[in-house]
């Protein structure tokens, strides 16, 4: 059921954005539809990153989602959101966070299952270390390697997804 709810939220988000709604308006409309469900309370995390390819500015809207990680030339930065999941309350707090990405930066977005597979209290630091020590490769290769390393901890009971996006100058 969680999978079908996630697919519904993703489909709605895509449709609203394709129809020309702003990211914020689309998320607020989805939140309202989840809050007003008559049969059951449905909650959904949303993790949205929009990168302006001309300026390199990445805007994050993190709605109850896990931390993301930005791998730079000299380290890994953790990006948090502090809002509750969509569907919890009619008043959704949207606090966009912007960060400039530069040539060679890599953005790692992970589901809560990835962090949940790591030792409690150390999740983010372990993931930062794993990302920082990943050998160079394509984003797909790096995502696969990271997932394999996290799975080696053996604590995963939830689904795990890793998405890696890179920025390079032409």
Language model segments and positions:
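Short, structured beta-strand/loop micro-motifs enriched in basic residues and often containing a Trp
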Residues: 86-91
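Catalytic core of PPM/PP2C metal-dependent serine/threonine phosphatase domains
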Residues: 2-74, 80, 94, 148-160, ...
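Intrinsically disordered or compositionally simple regulatory linkers and C-terminal tails
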Residues: 168-170
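Active-site-proximal, acidic helix/loop segment immediately C-terminal to a metal-coordinating Asp/Glu
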Residues: 1-19, 80-83, 101, 105-157
């Amino acid at each position: 059921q969680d999978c079908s709810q996630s697919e519904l939220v993703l489909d709605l988000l895509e449709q609203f954005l394709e129809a020309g709604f702003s990211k914020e308006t689309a998320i607020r409309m989805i939140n309202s539809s989840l809050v007003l469900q008559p049969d059951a309370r449905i909650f959904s995390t949303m993790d949205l990153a929009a990168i302006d390819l001309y300026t390199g500015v990445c805007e994050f809207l993190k709605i109850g989602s896990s931390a993301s990680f930005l791998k730079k030339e000299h380290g890994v930065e953790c990006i948090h959101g502090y809002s509750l999941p969509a569907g919890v309350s009619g008043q959704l707090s949207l606090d966009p966070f912007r960060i400039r990405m530069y040539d060679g930066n890599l953005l790692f977005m992970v589901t809560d299952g990835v962090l949940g597979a790591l030792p409690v209290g150390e999740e983010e630091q372990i993931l930062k270390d794993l990302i920082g020590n990943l050998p160079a490769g394509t984003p797909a290769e790096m995502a696969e390697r990271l997932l394999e390393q996290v799975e080696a901890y053996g604590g995963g009971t939830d689904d795990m997804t890793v998405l890696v996006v890179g920025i390079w100058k032409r």
